[in-house]
């Protein structure tokens, strides 16, 4: 029977893969008071575990292609999880590839990196190192930034022309751990005798991925203009925000106001990104650097056509050499230090497509790249027979603890519509973002509500 004529009541009903993002099992009963999943009323999940075949899989360290750190296996994340699920095998992650190249010395001969230094030397410009200063190992590695300082020293590049724009974390790290990471960075600066921190900003602004362009604009203007409060040191910028957050729900490193670091206004102006400079964005994960990278690199026509309109960036910077640690998105006009390895053969989406079967991928905006781009091994375009649906994530709140249901109902309805269709696909992959995105806010009450919403939606689909 043709896949297009098969329905859920046919001999070959669809297989539905439901990904409850951020949903896990904590084996330590002593921590139950901090476990939103344990505290939530989840009758559907309880029934599935009690009455249907159930297993647990490990999602960290070498089981998903990540290293073993000083404190044990490095935790997985949404990108890593979706790529491993889609591949059906352990996938060596970008973090490992880059770290190995540093250990072998190949990193310091990387052609794209050397070109960034050469360009700034030729124009008399500066090299700006931009990225997440954190040991979360989800988007970046502080050790990679220190290696870039080492590379600058090895090339003999003037230390006062190596400028660091530090993005603070607070999502994959403790909420106020940023001061400690900035201190660790300062030790790296001093040991190599090169570089200085010239701006600090929370990832809420510099690493948006939901087209909240007003956030990206605040980061961009801090990087290119005399915009934002000025502080004498990076630590002072973070501590000032801890003392006076912009909103009651915006605590910690994630939300640090884009801030200038310098002795005075003249010093600040001298350290902004300008014509003829080089920028090295050292984040290795691709989804969150895309928006601000586009603001720096797209020509005027492409910038005018970005989704949801972008912002008025003024005149595009001229003769800017922008280098990304990895390929954030195909078609971006940037130099790339570490290109993706050859695509894997036999991943799930390809196997389904090659068999002449159809598939449906669905998520809200926050997780749509995960069920498409990451699930398909960094493939932007759909496979033949792959249908996609994106449900907009809420934009009327600044943090999802204010709306823990997010857009789960819309995602559920999109799946139910396909299940009821005469041409229902043979494979449905759906992501519910709530557990992860609301959990990151640190609000127990909201996280419990998020889990209960997801459980109800899964029950409707089943």
Language model features: what each stretch is:
Residues 12-14, 415-436:
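Active-site regions of oxyanion-processing enzymes, predominantly non-cytosolic
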Residues 146, 295-301, 447:
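Short, solvent-exposed amphipathic alpha-helical segments in soluble enzyme
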Residues 146-160, 410-420, 435-462:
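A long, amphipathic alpha-helix that forms part
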């Amino acid at each position: 029977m043709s896949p297009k004529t098969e329905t859920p009541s046919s001999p070959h009903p669809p297989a539905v893969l439901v990904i409850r993002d951020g949903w896990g099992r904590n084996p330590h009963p002593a921590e139950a008071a901090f476990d939103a999943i344990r505290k939530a009323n989840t009758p559907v999940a309880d029934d599935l575990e009690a009455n249907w075949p159930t297993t647990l899989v490990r999602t960290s360290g070498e089981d998903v292609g990540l290293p073993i750190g000083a404190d044990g296996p490095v935790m997985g994340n949404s990108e890593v999880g979706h790529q491993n699920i889609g591949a059906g095998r352990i996938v060596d992650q970008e973090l490992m590839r880059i770290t190995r190249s540093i250990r072998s010395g190949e990193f310091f001969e990387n052609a794209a990196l050397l070109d960034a230094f050469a360009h700034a030397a030729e124009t008399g410009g500066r090299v700006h190192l931009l990225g997440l200063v954190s040991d979360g190992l989800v988007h970046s590695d502080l050790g990679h930034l220190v290696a870039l300082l080492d590379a600058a020293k090895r090339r003999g590049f003037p230390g006062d022309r190596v400028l660091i724009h530090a993005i603070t974390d607070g999502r994959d790290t403790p909420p106020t751990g940023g001061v400690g990471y900035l201190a660790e960075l300062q030790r790296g600066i001093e040991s190599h005798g090169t570089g200085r921190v010239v701006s600090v900003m929370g990832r809420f602004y510099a690493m948006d991925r939901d087209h909240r362009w007003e956030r990206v604009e605040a980061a961009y203007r801090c990087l290119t203009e005399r915009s934002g409060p000025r502080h004498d040191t990076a630590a002072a910028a973070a501590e000032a925000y801890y003392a006076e957050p912009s909103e009651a729900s915006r605590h910690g490193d994630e939300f640090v106001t884009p801030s200038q670091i310098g002795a005075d206004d003249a010093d600040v102006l001298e350290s902004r990104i300008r014509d003829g400079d080089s920028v090295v964005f050292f984040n290795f994960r691709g989804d969150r650097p895309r928006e601000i990278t586009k603001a720096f690199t797209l020509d005027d026509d492409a910038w005018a056509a970005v989704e949801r309109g972008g912002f008025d960036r003024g005149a595009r910077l001229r003769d800017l050499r922008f280098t990304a640690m990895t390929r954030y998105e195909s078609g971006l006009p940037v130099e790339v230090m570490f290109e993706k390895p050859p695509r894997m053969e036999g991943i799930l989406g390809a196997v389904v497509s090659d068999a002449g079967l159809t598939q449906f991928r669905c998520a809200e905006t926050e997780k749509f790249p995960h069920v498409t781009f990451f699930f398909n091994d960094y493939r932007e375009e759909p496979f033949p027979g792959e249908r996609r649906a994106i449900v907009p994530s809420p934009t009327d709140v600044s943090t999802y603890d204010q709306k823990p249901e997010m857009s789960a109902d819309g995602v559920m309805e999109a799946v139910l519509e396909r299940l009821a269709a005469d041409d229902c696909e043979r494979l449905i992959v759906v992501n519910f973002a709530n557990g992860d995105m609301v959990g990151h806010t640190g609000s127990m009450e909201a996280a419990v509500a998020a889990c209960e919403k997801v459980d109800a939606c899964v029950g409707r689909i089943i």
